[in-house]
Regions:
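Alpha-helical tetratricopeptide repeat
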Residues: 1-253
Length: 253
């Protein structure tokens, strides 16, 4: 039932998916996986009261279930309950200190709340774990700008562009920072490249030119692909669709 529910969800049939999840829970009320899956579906429908009930139940059944804590943190975030969000993310990191996905999200929330030094520490750890994480460089650069550490920001934008040469928003931001440093000729060059990248993107994506002209669409939900929660024995459905359901916070995009 859980697998068929996942298949229905993949096909966009949420009614049949929820029906199968309900059946799975009825058959085994002590398996947290059914509650987590149903709760995530409720959250996608913005039925947060029901979603929270399911996630609470999953955690009650398995107090070390980091995937449930992580998903509940996202639900708290959507409801702007930031202390509760941080509490659950911290709980994940108690069990899994090297969970890059959780560190990344916690770093972005620290930045949103103005705790820039804490944000830098989290993003530093993310990049130690996954040096190829484009958005971690991009967002850390934005934090450096807030701290007026402009040369550090330029270096992080350089790295983001090296990893993703079509990242127009990174070119644009780098142009802005170089202008602040008085490097006007370099700033103009970076700006011109950004405009060219945007034009190329629009030419290839005519129907979607307005919403993602900065070319960040490819990375809007990409963070690390090393399946931090795999050891919790959730099957491939949970991990495969994680990037869709997590909707990572790219606060400086």
């Amino acid at each position: 039932y859980l697998n068929r529910g996942a298949s229905y969800l993949f096909l966009g049939d949420t009614l049949k998916a929820i029906s199968d999840y309900n059946k799975a829970i009825k058959l085994d009320r002590f398996d947290p996986e059914g509650y987590v899956r149903r709760g995530r579906l409720y959250a996608a429908q913005k039925k947060y009261d029901l979603a929270m009930e399911d996630m609470d139940r999953a955690i009650e059944l398995d107090t070390a279930n980091t995937f449930a804590y992580f998903n509940r943190a996202l639900m708290y975030y959507e409801q702007e309950k930031y202390p509760e969000t941080m509490r659950d993310l911290n709980k994940v990191l108690e069990y899994e200190p090297g969970n890059a996905l959780t560190l990344y999200n916690r770093g972005l929330i620290h930045a949103q709340l103005g705790a820039y030094e804490d944000a830098l520490q989290d993003l530093d750890r993310v990049l130690n774990i996954n040096p190829g994480n484009v958005l971690a460089y991009f967002n850390r650069a934005s934090i450096f700008v807030e701290l007026k550490q402009f040369q550090n920001a330029v270096e992080d934008y350089d790295k983001a562009i090296e990893l993703y040469p079509d990242f127009a928003k990174a070119y644009m931001n780098r142009s802005y920072v170089k202008n602040l440093l008085g490097r006007n000729k370099e700033a103009r060059k970076a700006y011109d490249i950004a405009q060219r990248k945007v034009a190329e993107y629009r030419a290839k994506n005519v129907t979607d030119a307005g919403s993602f002209a900065d070319t960040t669409k490819k990375y809007s939900s990409l963070i690390s692909l090393d399946a931090e929660f795999a050891k919790k024995d959730f099957n491939d459905e949970l991990l495969q669709h994680r990037d869709i359901d997590i909707r990572l916070r790219s606060l400086y995009k």
